[in-house]
Amino acid sequence: IHDVWIEDGIAYSSNWKHGVYMIDVGNGVAGGSPSNPVAMSNYSYESGAHHATFPFKSKSTDKFYTVLGDEIFPQGIDVYTTNETAGFIHFVDFTDINNPEEVARYELPGHGSHNYWIENDILYVAMYTGGVRIVDISGELMGDLFRQGREIGHINTANPNGYIPNAAMTWGAQLYKGYVF
């Protein structure tokens, strides 16, 4: 288990190669409680690099997604260089929890994803050496969101005068009172 997100009594557990698990830990919809958790659904994908999960109900379509993030470092990566990371954000439609389906992704070539935040149908994602990316995820989600031009802004966190020039390794992006931290 890596990250766990709990919303409305349902835990979304990120389990690397085993994917994401939805577990009733107090919602009661599957008879679960904190002392008696009950697995509801799961979804895994080929890369086996499932690092983070964020439940997301689209305001514009009313569909329910889990947004899954990869974390992939090339063999032998040195975190004190500008080596490229890999991995992307998967959008899995969990509207029918018995038949989850990956419908879209956000992949920034040469930069892997880490942590992210969603608010008002906008994704704020830390892309390690790619800085922070801001992506419109309103409407129907299908295919490659980067190639569709859904990125609406970015913050370049690389600094040529940094301790390690241009080795930003951005880990998180969280919105708070209109600011991204």
Describe the residue ranges of each PLM region.
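Feature marking well-ordered beta-strand scaffolds used for ligand recognition
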Residues: 1-181
